[in-house]
UniProtKB/Swiss-Prot annotation:
It comes from Tropheryma whipplei (strain Twist). The keyword Transmembrane helix does not apply. Belongs to the glutamyl-tRNA reductase family. This is Glutamyl-tRNA reductase. During catalysis, the active site Cys acts as a nucleophile attacking the alpha-carbonyl group of tRNA-bound glutamate with the formation of a thioester intermediate between enzyme and glutamate, and the concomitant release of tRNA(Glu). The thioester intermediate is finally reduced by direct hydride transfer from NADPH, to form the product GSA. The keyword NADP applies.
């Protein structure tokens, strides 16, 4: 049975999300060592932490809830979060509700900014990492692969792409009220990943030409080799000569503290291109004279890249995920509604496909049984081509109605009835168990 423990910006505080971001990706490997779990994959973003599980269904609904509770408690232990807090601030989904949720997530319908596109790549990478660590299962792979396909279908069929902008884009929009002329801004990007690349592209679109990149881990990749971009190795020194810092790195602790900013501003010698919020743009000359050094810091990291105490400084403006959640724009309701309907429809189709997939052992056993009868009969007729063709045509005609009925039963979660009939009538045994993983928990979420 597919299960999901979800912590996200809708229900979980960013303080808890920050703690969850420190959970090692190897947690999935720990989960699959349990005898009742076949597979696990972790989706972790700046405003979401979700664990997807393929669990062996042994009992009733209470056993399903017990598995979810055990996973929630273990997550709490890893992050030093109390059981009551982790249960209160996470959701537990089971059965068909899992596919409906992931399809909505992959399409950006559950994002802080409706329709944003970064999440689709993050869903793909979550599956890739699980495959690399050998923690996935066939059922989980089908789920994640279908989620990517549904994302493409919904974006092609609706105007959801026109609704969503990225967190990076929104953060730069908010920063615009503090910046007079983007072309003169001196920017530093902390990090070298996907968000850093997005930040680099958007800064260039706005006319920023003075861009540096700092990697806390010392990792060098394509963004560090981009034309016109400088690599810096001493962040403290670079801070004194910059206006804007964008944090997009995965770090365990802040790379810039309040004291770092105070030191940088005390030693800064260049006029800042940043103005205090509320000052009219016509007053730039006075601002430059009175604010020799001022910073805007955009923190997109989880855990935080920058010390939240920086916001206490009168000469620094900190834009973080809490602020972005408040300023996230209203969505296009028509496009969102249509996208949600398609996600629900796709989830129903996925569940139906999975139910029919569960009937595969029954169908294969029945086909093998009839094939053996066919071969036995052919040996008695000198195996001539005419007889072979006629007999196979007869078998295919004979099997059509039973297999159609089997698929209908499977769609209702009753493929075991066909399996039982096969065993009674023909002594054909299969591994098909009673019911399906989607029957008892369909439509259930446990908050």
């Amino acid at each position: 049975m597919l299960l999901c423990v979800s912590a996200n910006h809708k229900k979980t505080s960013f303080t808890v999300l920050e703690q969850l971001a420190r959970v090692s990706p190897d947690f999935a490997s720990e989960l699959v060592e349990a005898e009742d779990i076949d597979g696990a994959a972790i989706l972790s973003t700046c405003n979401r932490f979700e664990v997807y599980i393929d669990a062996i269904q042994k009992g009733d609904q209470d056993d399903v809830c017990k598995t979810g509770l055990l996973v929630q408690n273990r997550i709490g232990e890893l992050c030093n979060i109390s059981p009551s807090t982790i249960i209160e601030q996470t959701s537990f989904l089971a059965g068909c509700e899992v596919s409906r949720h992931l399809f909505s997530v992959a399409t950006g319908l559950e994002s802080m900014i409706i329709g944003e596109t970064e999440i689709a790549g993050q869903v793909k990478r979550a599956l890739t990492y699980a495959q690399k660590c050998r923690t996935t299962s066939p059922e989980l792979e089908r789920l994640f692969q279908r989620a990517s396909a549904v994302n493409r279908h919904i974006r092609q069929s609706t105007k959801i792409n026109e609704v969503g902008q990225s967190l990076v884009s929104l953060s730069l929009d908010l920063a615009s009220s503090r910046i007079g002329d983007w072309s003169g801004v001196r920017a530093i990007i902390v990090g070298t990943g996907k968000y850093a690349s997005k930040a680099l592209a958007l800064l260039k679109e706005r006319g920023v030409v003075d861009i540096s990149v700092y990697s806390p881990s010392g990792h060098v990749n394509n963004i560090c080799n981009t034309e016109g971009v400088r690599n810096i190795f001493n962040l403290q020194t670079a801070l004194s000569g910059c206006d804007l810092v964008v944090g997009c790195s995965s770090v365990d602790k802040p790379v810039i503290t309040k004291q770092d900013i105070e030191t940088a501003q005390a030693s800064g010698s260049r006029t800042s291109r940043v103005r205090p919020v509320g000052r009219p743009s016509t007053d730039l000359t006075a601002i430059e004279a009175s604010n020799r050094s001022r910073h805007v810091l955009i923190d997109l990291g989880l855990p935080r890249n920058f010390d939240p105490a920086i916001s206490d400084l009168p000469t620094a403006d900190l834009i973080d995920l809490d602020m972005l959640r408040v300023h996230a724009p209203f969505d296009n309701l028509a496009a969102e509604k249509m996208a949600h309907e398609l996600a629900i429809e796709s989830s129903s189709q996925f569940v139906n496909d999975c139910k029919q997939h569960e009937a595969t052992p029954v169908i294969v056993s029945f086909r093998n049984y009839l094939e053996s009868l066919t071969q036995t009969s052919l040996r008695r007729t000198d195996n001539c081509k005419h007889a072979q063709h006629a007999l196979k045509h007869f078998v295919n005609s004979l099997i059509h109605i039973p297999l159609t009925r089997c698929k209908q039963l499977a769609a209702n979660g009753e493929s075991h009835k066909f399996a039982e009939s096969m065993e009674i009538l023909f002594d054909v045994k299969t591994d098909c168990t009673e019911g399906t993983q989607y029957q008892s928990s369909c439509g259930k979420s446990f908050d």
